[in-house]
């Protein structure tokens, strides 16, 4: 095998169009991201059809910019990695069809990547010496998992949400208290002005034999609290509501993740996904894990949100295992972690 494997990666699962050039799964030569946040902000959330159209408009330019920044041409690329699920089916298809076209035209192998595996692999970029096994908390707008990573590309899901994802709950609560979209960063910001102990919102407690999450109850409790306040004509302290809600979500995430580490006797937690940027989650996880002698690894913001560099990293580890993807692959919006 060549000393350096160069992956051109494409990501378009939701509302970011991204392309990157990644060498050997850990060195990022370029990571171009065209965000659609300002486009969807006026709608209060991502509109799938609008997202797809925006991807179509920019994907060619984004891929070319990624190659140019890396000072590469397609001749320098060994394989093309692309997200094929989970995500919005229309958005996924834009990136997938573009990648398939490149693979067909150049004869380069195609490697389909699970978006969640990409989030986990972002840690290999930031932490060059990181190797499995380790625990990973994946928290994003559409997904919440506790994953035991046994080896590269080998996962055991120990816990997952039974209803709303953590990021989805953040967005819905932010909308309810008038903060708008995107909800996660706005709740994080206003919470710094509030009292996290002002309101006691419930935590979902399942039996001890599961590490699953449930955030719909917390979300409903917030909505009920707001409705009661409005019916009584009482003033609502948005900062207190946001801080109390945030604490209830973070407490559950941290508690279950530490329990997972104890069950597998691992001393390393990696965090992945957009909600990993939340300052309360970062601070609480680091503080509580320190008490247990557990190391916490959290990538920088640019690698927490959707990006193609993480897809390039995951694609590399698939590539060296000899895995290749047929050009007749289709988008799988509900793709499960570990499915091939």
UniProtKB/Swiss-Prot annotation:
InterPro entries in the record: ATPase_NBD (IPR043129), Gcp-like_dom (IPR000905), KAE1/TsaD (IPR017861), TsaD (IPR022450)
Top-rank taxon, per record: Bacteria
Residues holding Fe cation: 115, 119, 306
Reactions listed under catalytic activity: L-threonylcarbamoyladenylate + adenosine(37) in tRNA = N(6)-L-threonylcarbamoyladenosine(37) in tRNA + AMP + H(+)
The protein's Enzyme Commission number: 2.3.1.234
GO molecular function: iron ion binding; N(6)-L-threonylcarbamoyladenine synthase activity
Gene3D superfamilies in UniProt: 3.30.420.40
Keywords recorded for this protein, A-Z: Acyltransferase, Cytoplasm, Iron, Metal-binding, Transferase, tRNA processing
Cofactor notes: Binds 1 Fe(2+) ion per subunit.
Cellular component annotations (GO), alphabetically ordered: cytoplasm
Cofactor: Fe(2+)
Residue sites binding substrate per the record: 138-142, 171, 184, 188, 278
Enzyme class: transferase
The name this protein goes by in its record: tRNA N6-adenosine threonylcarbamoyltransferase
């Amino acid at each position: 095998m060549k000393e350096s494997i160069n992956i051109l990666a494409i990501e378009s699962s939701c509302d970011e169009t991204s392309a990157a050039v990644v060498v050997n799964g850990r060195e990022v030569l370029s990571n171009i991201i065209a965000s659609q946040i300002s486009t969807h902000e006026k709608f209060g959330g991502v509109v799938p059809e609008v997202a797809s159209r925006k991807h179509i408009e920019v994907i060619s330019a984004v891929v070319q910019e990624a190659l140019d920044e890396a000072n590469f041409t397609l001749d320098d690329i060994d394989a093309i990695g692309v997200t094929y699920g989970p995500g919005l089916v229309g958005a996924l298809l834009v990136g997938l069809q573009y990648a398939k076209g490149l693979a067909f035209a150049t004869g380069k192998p195609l490697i389909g990547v699970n978006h969640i595996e990409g989030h986990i692999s972002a840690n290999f970029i930031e932490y060059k010496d990181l190797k499995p096994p380790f625990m990973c908390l994946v928290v994003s707008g559409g997904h919440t998992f506790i994953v035991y990573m046994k080896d590269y590309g080998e996962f055991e899901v120990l816990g997952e949400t039974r209803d709303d994802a953590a990021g989805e709950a953040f967005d819905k609560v932010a909308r309810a208290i008038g903060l708008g979209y995107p909800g996660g960063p706005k709740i994080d910001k206003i919470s710094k002005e509030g009292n996290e102990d002002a309101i006691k919102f419930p935590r979902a407690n399942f039996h001890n034999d599961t590490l699953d999450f449930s955030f719909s109850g917390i979300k409903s409790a917030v909505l009920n609290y707001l409705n009661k306040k409005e019916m009584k004509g009482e003033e609502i302290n948005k900062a207190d509501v946001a801080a109390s809600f945030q604490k209830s979500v973070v407490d559950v995430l941290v508690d279950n993740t530490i329990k997972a580490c104890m069950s597998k006797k691992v001393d390393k937690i990696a965090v992945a996904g957009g909600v990993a940027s939340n300052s309360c989650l970062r601070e609480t996880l680091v503080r509580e894990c320190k008490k247990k002698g557990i190391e916490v690894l959290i990538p920088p913001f640019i690698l927490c949100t959707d990006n193609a560099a993480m897809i390039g990293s995951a694609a590399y580890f698939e590539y060296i295992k000899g895995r290749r993807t047929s050009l007749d692959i289709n988008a799988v919006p509900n793709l499960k972690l570990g499915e091939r």
